[in-house]
Amino acid sequence: MEKLTMLVLVAAVLLSAQVMVQGDGDQPADRDAVPRDDNPGGTIGKIMNVLLPSGCPWNPWCG
């Protein structure tokens, strides 16, 4: 009975090690990627970038 218990424990350890090595095959490669913020100012910043492409609301003083 002790040999059977040891065999079951060894099989469980090997199986868990195999699962850890293989990992999740169905997950995309970029699951940890952070989406890039193209408009850090939000909607207002996007509108201002269209209206004033230089990004400066005071055109004469922006050099």
Swiss-Prot record:
Secreted keyword on record: yes
Modified residues (4-hydroxyproline): 57
Annotated Gene Ontology cellular component terms: extracellular region
Cysteine amide sites (modified residues): 62
Record localization: Secreted
Residues recorded with modification D-tryptophan: 58
Signal peptide: 1-23
Molecular function (Gene Ontology), one example: ion channel inhibitor activity
Expression by tissue: Expressed by the venom duct.
Record keywords, A-Z: Amidation, D-amino acid, Disulfide bond, Hydroxylation, Ion channel impairing toxin, Neurotoxin, Secreted, Signal, Toxin
InterPro entries linked to this entry: Conotoxin, Contryphan_CS
Disulphide-bonded residues: 56-62
Propeptide: 24-54
Further comment: Exists in two forms, due to cis-trans isomerization at 56-Cys-hydroxyPro-57. The cis conformation is the major form.
Domain notes from UniProt: The cysteine framework is C-C.
Protein family: Belongs to the O2 superfamily. Contryphan family.
Function: Its target is unknown, but this toxin may modulate voltage-activated calcium channels (Cav) or calcium-dependent potassium channels (KCa).
Designated name of the protein: Contryphan-Li1
